[in-house]
Amino acid sequence: MKASEIRSAFLKFFESKGHQIVASSPVVPGDDPTLLFTNAGMNQFKDVFLGFDKRPYSRATTAQKCIRAGGKHNDLENVGYTARHHTFFEMLGNFSFGDYFKQDAIAYAWELLTEVFKLPKDKLWVTVYAEDDEAYEIWNKQVGVPAERIVRIGDNKGARYASDNFWMMGDTGPCGPCTEIFYDHGPEIPGGPPGSPDEDGDRYIEIWNNVFMQFNRDEAGVMHKLPKPSVDTGMGLERITAVLQHVHSNYEIDLFVALLAAAKQAVDAAGAGDSDKDSPSLKVIADHIRACSFTIVDGVIPGNEGRGYVLRRIARRGIRHGYKLGARKPFFHTLVAELVRQMGEAYPELARAEARVTEVLKQEEERFFQTIANGMEILESALAGGAKTLDGETAFKLHDTYGFPLDLTADVCRERGVTVDQAGFDAAMKRQREQARAAGKFKMAAGLEYAGAATTFHGYEHLVHEGSKVTAVYVDGSAVPSAKAGDDAVIVLDHTPFYAESGGQVGDGGELRNGTSRVIVEDTQKIQADVFGHHGRVVEGEIRVGDVLNARVDGEQRARTVRNHSVTHLMHKALREVLGGHVQQKGSLVNAERTRFDFAHNAPMSDAQIAKVEAIVNAEILANAPTQARVLPMEEAQKLGAMMLFGEKYGDEVRVLDIGSSRELCGGTHVQRTGDIGLFKVVAESGVAAGIRRVEAITGDNALAYVQQLEGTVAGLAGALKAAPAEVPGRVAAVLEQLRTLEKELAALKGKLASSQGDGLLAQAVDVKGLKVLAARLEGADAKALRDTLDQLKNKLKSAAIVLAVVEGGKVQLAAGVTADATARVKAGELVNFVAQQVGGKGGGKPDLAMAGGTDPAGLGAALASVAGWVGERA
């Protein structure tokens, strides 16, 4: 049976047992920002097991795409060097949500393995949790597995219920014993049965795990029986395929045989020649193309953090192993086509995204091959001395200057038996960060110590708060009892309507005052998570700790800022709609003037795409829908599908913002209705880093002023061209075409002028040791005419060294040429550099032709006069 047939047989078997076939969820969890990648079949059913979600079925079966390449589940370093480690794999599973339990689960597993897959019964071993007598009895008495092939596994991880055969979702919650099924590859393979001292050998291989969730563990560690126990099982498709195809390694199954052949062909074509078909590097490449492709399909692009970083690390590891085999140009992306042939039918989303996946990987390869070329040369040089440790400074230089990741350096070193000085690397990294902080913008939180009451924020509802008490005053970074007129101060209040900078939104400005004192607030930032510092200048009186002030936010500044913040949410949603679900926020800055939004995307936006985003957002604005903000438990926010950023730390309760069709977690301030935004206009789109784009946009009166300015510019052009505004593009195109024609005519005239001068220069050539030497200035020539005239003179003088110069706009252009028969004696590059240095410049080139420039025309005459002497010394 092929892998595809085994996958299908598994799903059809459980469908015949009343299970709903459920499609694989994406490898990127859509509702769990704490989970890097989907790493088990049960991930998509987590809320069902916890009781937060109800499904219309109580039995399910899946073939789940999984990735284990980061965090606790990280198999990356082993991939390619063992028979069964992968970054991407498929987990076949069957699930019972309070329906059947141990007896049926075990019976189904046995029936599938022995009757459908026809595995010999005497080749199968099982393990059970030591205290799970029920599972033991089912295996022994009902299924008929002999006692000598049933192994009880107790608490073997240093604590109660800490066992390979006891599964827990977390410190609390659903948990229970599990039973694992092993296949015996036979005595010719080293290794002992599970639970024995030699269990880590390859003879006995786990192929299926059945978890029986029958307890709920409370915070005290007490186990309470669940009223409706459930079943969660997982069987790796690659492992069971290896067993059924009678091969020992997963890399020998049909799916990998095809990918390995494609990998070898691609690597060989990229410069390897004839790579070793059994090389671990080919296995790395074949494995990694699966992980990379499915990750990109589900919306991730290579980056420097989170999932994007893991994707980049996997892709670059695969590329480097091709480089190790001899590949010297991009090859990795070409394997996507073969992967689609192998898995596109089972996962149609892969086939649909083939072109996009290929292009993303191609771009990453092109960037990384340049990085490899620079970094490997330095690393090889550092390792050539034979030291057993690579110093941290060198590792950091590779990382910081050449973009060579530390893990890649560690991979290369590990293969040479060399360790990396991690402590030295960390010290260099820390030093750089400290230097960057010292050179960066002052943040009021730096160095301000505060131990008073928290600040209560009232700014969602009000722009004014009366009766705010001063709890701390800082001047020049130090806590003081008071600040007087003229002081630049930071003032902490117990209650405030001022929004403190957070989530990309800048802090509010405004005014603090009482009967005798006044402070102009320029910025508001957080000293601590719940303590707001109001930074400004005392303009009247004196502000003391304990004073009571009235706090008033600058309403116009806030209104402009909230328009820009609210439109950022609508723009994010529109970008995902236009460009794809892979778009993810990477940074933002929202102030009163504009919004700046950085997001993951691997190509510049077209004018049509920008126009579509503008149309979608402005349609949302015209709908004038009300904005709703709610504080909800995190679990409820997840169920509502609120967008959240991976890697962000959220509390038990979160603020969910609904604006138009967007639903995100956000603590910022926003408009009451979408119509309050007024107008939305994108003013710039650019790239800020590999795989990161930036959009800048404006709203409201700023957008109106921008459009009016553009209209004024067009009107001015129309007047100059004596045309109607609608005719401006056509008129400009006609003028540009006329300009191009005139430029061609001018260039031709310059060429003729230079050529005519060249004929007159032949008589100026002097004989220097059998070589004709000519150094002269042309008038009215450009760079092309200079080169053309030089070529004509070389042809006519036969054996010569020539320097021609032209002065235009206060700058000197030089061209030097040496005929082929004389380049052994005189080099054009050296000659032109000699002349250029005398006119304030430098240059170089090939032995027969070289160009240079200079900034000092006054020295040109003497420089040209020195050419014959210079040639004479070398000829």
Curated annotation (Swiss-Prot):
Domain-related comment: Consists of three domains; the N-terminal catalytic domain, the editing domain and the C-terminal C-Ala domain. The editing domain removes incorrectly charged amino acids, while the C-Ala domain, along with tRNA(Ala), serves as a bridge to cooperatively bring together the editing and aminoacylation centers thus stimulating deacylation of misacylated tRNAs.
Record organism: Methylibium petroleiphilum (strain ATCC BAA-1232 / LMG 22953 / PM1)
Gene Ontology BP term (one): negative regulation of DNA-templated transcription
Cofactor(s) listed in the protein's UniProt record: Zn(2+)
EC code(s) of this entry: 6.1.1.7
Subcellular location: Cytoplasm
InterPro entries: aa-tRNA-synth_II/BPL/LPL, Ala-tRNA-lgiase_IIc, Ala-tRNA-ligase_IIc_anticod-bd, Ala-tRNA-synth_IIc_core, Ala-tRNA-synth_IIc_N, Ala-tRNA_ligase, Ala_tRNA_ligase_euk/bac, DHHA1_dom
Cofactor note: Binds 1 zinc ion per subunit.
GO molecular function annotation: alanine-tRNA ligase activity; aminoacyl-tRNA deacylase activity; ATP binding; tRNA binding; zinc ion binding
Name assigned to this protein: Alanine--tRNA ligase
Keyword Cytoplasm: yes
Function (record text): Catalyzes the attachment of alanine to tRNA(Ala) in a two-step reaction: alanine is first activated by ATP to form Ala-AMP and then transferred to the acceptor end of tRNA(Ala). Also edits incorrectly charged Ser-tRNA(Ala) and Gly-tRNA(Ala) via its editing domain.
One cellular-component annotation, GO: cytosol
Gene name of the encoded protein: alaS
Catalytic activity as recorded in UniProt: tRNA(Ala) + L-alanine + ATP = L-alanyl-tRNA(Ala) + AMP + diphosphate
Ligand binding (Zn(2+)): H565, H569, C666, H670
Alphabetic keyword roster: Aminoacyl-tRNA synthetase, ATP-binding, Cytoplasm, Ligase, Metal-binding, Nucleotide-binding, Protein biosynthesis, RNA-binding, tRNA-binding, Zinc
Main location per the UniProt record: cytoplasm
Family: Belongs to the class-II aminoacyl-tRNA synthetase family.
CDD domains: AlaRS_core
UniProt xrefs under NCBIfam families: alaS (TIGR00344)
